[in-house]
Amino acid sequence: MTDTTPRYGFPISSVFFQICVTIFITLLLFLTIISNFIVGSFLIIVSLFCFWYFLILNFKKKFFSLREKILHQMISQAHLTGIERVLDLGTGAGYIAIQFSKLLDSGTVIGVDKYDQHTPVLGSNFFEELKINFFGNTLEQARQNARIENQQDKIIFVKSDLKRHFPFSNESYNVILSSQFLYCIPQKKIEKVLTEIDRVLKPSGKLIFFESKKFLNWDIAKIQLFFNRLGYHTQIHPLNNMPNKCIFIAKKP
């Protein structure tokens, strides 16, 4: 049966939370079976299950609402005319790329990611590759989503590990997007990636990044400093209800 609804996935924390709660309820059920308090324990299990279900339902509802607000803020900063070439870094299942493609006429969106359907999970970063492949944030899913949204003619998905190779020409994009992609780049490689981003962005082009403000060794202020030194006009926009997230905007001279 052909899917008619795009699948853009959920935060990994949401999925792991559901798994943990499911394991907990299963364990509680096992303890119930081997105990003599079947009726009372059964009621506890039912109550916990209902609590878990509505908690997850509420979480997903809030997640969808926040994701849409973030998208609208990114779009409002792009000031698209419809003819732009747009590059989406770490596109995942293609949510940002596909929504931007809907606003283009003769323009094109390129979504790039290192994960496709056939990416092996037994690599150098097992847990990272496992979570991406297992939860479906792959280029294969992105292509399917584009077909479902009828955007396949305005968007191209490219496989590339951007930490190693940026397969794009100099000054070839008007807008470059990312959504929580840069903070995943190892610190020793981040400057190389940022230099490549600058290389492929056209003069007067824009960078629009949704990122954490600070996370472990990550600090958005360092990204701002890098582009300030290149003469970019930069801004960091805070997000309501997401105190540690922001949208980073930079315009190339």
Show where each model-derived region lies:
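Conserved beta-strand signature within the Rossmann-like core of class I S-adenosyl-L-methionine
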Residues: 204-211
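S-adenosyl-L-methionine
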Residues: 128-164
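Conserved SAM-binding loop of SAM-dependent methyltransferases across substrates and taxa
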Residues: 93-105
